Amino acid sequence: MPKLKTRKAAAKRFRATGSGNKIFRRKAYKNHLLYHKSAERKRRRLSGLALVSEEDIKEVRLMLPYL
């Protein structure tokens, strides 16, 4: 049986925790068009990592078989 391929675009966007139970992602809307967003919004709501929701974990695991 051949090896499963990893979706490289997804591999750059998701990371697993040490135990592998949870998957992290970056928050959206912080790449461009930032001048009209307040510093508070960028710092508090858009910074840091977020967990992938339970509903989406199955799809992420299909894209990343060796995660």
Swiss-Prot record:
Keyword list, A-Z: Ribonucleoprotein, Ribosomal protein
UniProt GO cellular component terms: cytosolic large ribosomal subunit
Domain of life: Bacteria
PROSITE patterns xref list: RIBOSOMAL_L35
One Gene Ontology term of the molecular function aspect: structural constituent of ribosome
InterPro entries given in the database record: Ribosomal_bL35 (IPR001706), Ribosomal_bL35-like (IPR021137), Ribosomal_bL35_CS (IPR018265), Ribosomal_bL35_sf (IPR037229)
GO biological process: translation
Family: Belongs to the bacterial ribosomal protein bL35 family.
Protein name: Large ribosomal subunit protein bL35
Gene: rpmI
